[in-house]
């Protein structure tokens, strides 16, 4: 029977808690620094300089870097000072960690402990540039650990299509709701329409229709997806829909 399945992952959204296996694996990795990690926002307006997106100034010690509340209390005043906010918890332990069962905590704790020991012994002796590098690595380790799990589970879906002989008769569309800053301009999050955030992943596999390896550079938008699916299914598009089918580009 014909089917349409929407397979949605929350994993890349903050707070970033990879599964225990990925948490341990990625905590050992070191990632290359973006060229603009230490951007000084010269010749740009106030918004770029003051937005709460800076990795050094705005990533939370607990919520994002996995520093335990008791570690922060022991160290007293931490620099840079991170302004409290109202829309979420200030640490990842009162909002996320408390929901883990004892077995899960046992798997997470050795990695969390090693992060906290290093932080306690080294943080106050670091320069701001060194602190920025450390917080960037912690951000990447957890964010990309979550992304890796998404990749694994997308692979399970694609494997199922192969195993059930559905691959050649199934259109697969991989996309997201927006791009994301991974250290470019010293930022995390997504708020500004710079190139890194404005671009959104879009990969389509349509057997016997789309040539493998085809790259399209025309600008499209996510409001085009509904019309594209209708067009693929041979269904007339309602006149009150705003997007345009991408099929002619494919």
Predicted regions and their residues:
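Short, intrinsically disordered, charge-balanced linker/junction segments flanking boundaries
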Residues: 1, 243-250
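Active-site-proximal cap/lid insertion segments
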Residues: 1, 6-169, 173-219, 232-240
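Zinc-coordinating Cys/His ligand positions in small cysteine/histidine-rich zinc-finger domains
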Residues: 222, 226
């Amino acid at each position: 029977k014909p089917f349409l399945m929407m397979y949605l992952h929350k994993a890349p959204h903050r707070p970033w808690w990879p599964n225990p296996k990925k948490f341990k694996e990625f905590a050992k990795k070191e990632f290359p620094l973006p060229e603009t990690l230490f951007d000084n926002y010269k010749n740009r307006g106030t918004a770029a300089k003051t937005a709460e997106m800076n990795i050094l100034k705005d990533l939370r010690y607990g919520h994002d870097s996995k520093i335990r509340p008791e570690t922060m209390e022991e160290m007293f005043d931490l620099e840079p000072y991170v302004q409290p906010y109202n829309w979420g918890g200030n640490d990842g332990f009162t909002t996320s960690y408390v929901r883990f069962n004892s077995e899960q905590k046992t798997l997470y704790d050795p990695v969390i402990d090693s992060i906290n020991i290093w932080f306690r012994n080294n943080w106050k002796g670091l320069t701001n540039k060194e602190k920025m590098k450390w917080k960037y690595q912690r951000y990447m380790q957890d964010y990309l650990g979550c992304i890796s799990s998404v990749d694994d589970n997308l692979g399970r879906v694609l494997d199922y299509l192969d195993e059930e002989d559905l691959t050649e008769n199934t259109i697969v569309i991989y996309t997201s709701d927006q791009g994301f800053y991974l250290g470019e301009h010293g930022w995390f999050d997504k708020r500004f329409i710079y190139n890194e955030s404005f671009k959104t992943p879009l990969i389509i596999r349509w057997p016997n229709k789309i040539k493998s390896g085809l790259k399209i550079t025309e600008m499209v938008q996510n409001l085009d997806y509904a019309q594209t699916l209708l067009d693929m299914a041979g269904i007339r598009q309602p006149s009150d829909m705003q997007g345009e089918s991408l099929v002619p580009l494919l």
